[in-house]
């Protein structure tokens, strides 16, 4: 609960400092329509985020949403990267340089919904490294990184102190282990 409160505090701080206005939130009905069209269900932690922040200029680039502006729409990204839809990966944000942050919905790396980074210039359909153990912690750490220039996610000690569940995910690279 404390991380959740810190997340919304930093979202509002980001919006104030960067003069960002949040777009309208998504809805439960939109999640159901999305799942019917794509066969990819929207997990509860992402629903919680999208009911507040749905396709906004938050972070280093943009966050993605459901039934929002086309360029920030998850379904539009699926038209560009159909492999992601086939794997039931949900893109949740980009880095402003053409790379993306996604969540696996089939629990292939462990329980829950961790967030991983895809470097489209290296391997557009494979995770490059794990970023966070949960969606809300990802957005919290991302915004702290943008606003406060933290050492996330590449500093192992810093990342594990902030995200103690990080190492429970397997079969995916950690950012400090990159070549």
PLM region descriptions:
Residues 114-146:
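Compact, glycine/acidic-enriched structural inserts
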Residues 31-35, 124, 161:
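Short, charged low-complexity linear motifs
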Residues 100-103, 111-113, 125-126:
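Short helix/loop capping segments that flank catalytic or ligand/cofactor-binding pockets
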Residues 42, 53, 57, 139-150:
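A generic secondary-structure signal for well-formed alpha-helical elements
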Residues 1-102, 107-108, 167-179:
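A surface-exposed partner-binding patch
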Residues 147-179:
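Acidic, proline/glycine-rich low-complexity IDRs
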Residues 16, 132, 155-156:
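Secreted/luminal cysteine- and crosslink-motif detector
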